Amino acid sequence: MARFFRRRKFCRFTAEGVKEIDYKDLNTLKAYVSETGKIVPSRITGTKAKYQRQLATAIKRARYLALLPYTDSHGR
């Protein structure tokens, strides 16, 4: 049987030296939200726990301020 190569996950925020995740940075936040509007877990993205917590808080703030949708757009 052939074993498939799994790409090593790494924390993008640690690599870039990000201190804090901003809720106004929508391009970054959209990368961590699934098509259905759910926050993608760290076991899939490889984000460290510290940044995953900041990410979740930032996404929730952006949703509350209507910068990000809570769910996908219905009726398409």
Curated annotation (Swiss-Prot):
GO terms for biological process: translation. InterPro entries: Ribosomal_bS18, Ribosomal_bS18_CS, Ribosomal_bS18_sf. GO terms for molecular function: small ribosomal subunit rRNA binding; structural constituent of ribosome. Pfam families: Ribosomal_S18 (PF01084). The keyword Transferase does not apply. It comes from the Bacteria. Keywords: Ribonucleoprotein, Ribosomal protein, RNA-binding, rRNA-binding. GO terms for cellular component: cytosolic small ribosomal subunit. The keyword Ribosomal protein applies. PANTHER family: 30S RIBOSOMAL PROTEIN S18, SMALL RIBOSOMAL SUBUNIT PROTEIN BS18M. HAMAP family: Ribosomal_bS18. Part of the 30S ribosomal subunit. Forms a tight heterodimer with protein bS6. Binds as a heterodimer with protein bS6 to the central domain of the 16S rRNA, where it helps stabilize the platform of the 30S subunit. Belongs to the bacterial ribosomal protein bS18 family. NCBIfam families: S18 (TIGR00165). This is Small ribosomal subunit protein bS18.
